[in-house]
Amino acid sequence: MSENLRSRAVTQGSQRTPNRAMLRAVGFGDDDFNKPIVGVANGFSTITPCNMGINDLAKRAEAGIKSAGGMPQMFGTITISDGISMGTEGMKYSLVSRDVIADSIETACNGQSMDGVIAIGGCDKNMPGAMIAMARMNIPAIFVYGGTIKPGHYNGEDLTVVSAFEAVGQHSAGKIDDNTLLAIERNACPGAGSCGGMFTANTMSSAFEVMGMSLPYSSTMAAEDAEKADSTEKSAFVLVNAIRNQILPRQILTRKAFENAVSVIMAVGGSTNAVLHLLAIANTIGVDLTLDDFETIRQRVPVLCDLKPSGRYVTVNLHQAGGIPQVMKMLLNHGLLHGDALTISGQTIAEILADVPDEPPANQDVIRSWDNPVYKEGHLAILKGNLASEGAVAKISGVKNPQITGPARVFESEEECLEAILAGKINAGDVIIVRYEGPRGGPGMREMLAPTSAIIGAGLGDSVGLITDGRFSGGTYGLVVGHVAPEAYVGGTIGLVEEGDSITIDAKKKLLQVNVSEEELSQRRANWKAPEPRYQRGVLGKYAKLVSSSSLGAVTDLNLF
């Protein structure tokens, strides 16, 4: 065991008698004060099915730490349920919770001089929140994903929570009746686990597996299956070994690791939120990662997995087909993955993938062969233009034509937009603008799943565009562009668009444009005034004051001094 344990600051020497006295009260004995103290950041909560099974995993982590020769100390972290808060004022707290989680893990681990930490989370912001904390602290760390939910079933079809969101649009358009709507509601979420498609939670857990901060195959396991608990205990053993060998996050989270993550996110058809979160983690650790890197990688990596929201299958199907390691092996064989990247186990990516088959199983079509991809290029395009000089993120999977030019339909909030869609006031060819929903303007950069699902449900998914300085749920698909930067609140051009202006979204040319002269835009800009802050105190007020542009990951600790 290393002599440079951080916890020696509270366990060694006569001056630490009172410290040890308190530790004895929580279970330490004479032989435990030379062991590494390992934090268990427990995201258990009954707020959401994503996190409701995590307490059992945390107990398995404790057992694993003890068996490996460490002393666990468990503490809680918060979560917000994106699915439950979606479409409400509460959604403004979702992205904020990412930074609250990061702050809480950093505070507990550094405040208690812990030697390492195993973080266990489920809902979307749990993953990046934990990883930001790990990047800040740079102590041995591993992430355990709470696991994915199994699909619901109704009328012979697999359901996810997004099925319920889309059913609202179908119902308002008269396509389904009240009984069908209620049946979908009752069957969409059958138990514990995070939302089942390749939505944000499963995207980020997959990214962390690729980056080497979670164990192989762990990101696609079902929350309720025994292998998830077994993997948690194994993760604890791996972490204690990393403490002994001082394998640190900043040795793992290199430029190569981020490039690997982006490649796999493209290959599995992952969430737009991954762009924001990876930028934030890279920003924290000092890795030079920009929006342009996502576009470069997108152009060379095909979408190999036919997963919801735009595809047919859910994450448990991906697990059965070989999981993330199978996708990684295919990318490695085609020169699109850095095999020499280090992982928390001490092995390289290439070493971990050595025994993984070169090709996916023949009797499935969840993971396509290299010669028969779902799409020849990645699905997350970075657009720029006079509407987004810093950039914006477009999700172009599941759309027949990634180009549209049409009249702007301008809304100052998500609620106004949703009301218009459900009232049948949006027509084919329209380009919806939802603004003042950015990191500062919202604040909190709400996800627009309710409006986009209503568009899909109304049958307008291929004929209506939607642009916002807010975000999209991982469950969103269609011709949608989010993360527009600069945002409206800080004077971005999206705040100058007027009803009826001609707007162009062109994913092929990577263009996001309002077709108005520069002279006209300059005149509008001269007359524009920043709105009063929506919140001046409390968590949201503090967040709006500190948060950076989405093009930098919307972090809250950049350029503080």
Swiss-Prot record:
GO biological process: isoleucine biosynthetic process; L-valine biosynthetic process
InterPro entries xrefs: DHAD_IlvD/Edd, Dihydro-acid_dehy_C, DihydroxyA_deHydtase, DiOHA_6PGluconate_deHydtase_CS, ILV_EDD_C, ILV_EDD_N, IlvD/EDD_N
Annotated positions binding Mg(2+): 82, 124-125, 447
Cofactor(s) of this protein: [2Fe-2S] cluster; Mg(2+)
Family assignment from sequence similarity: Belongs to the IlvD/Edd family.
Subunit-structure text: Homodimer.
Protein name in the entry: Dihydroxy-acid dehydratase
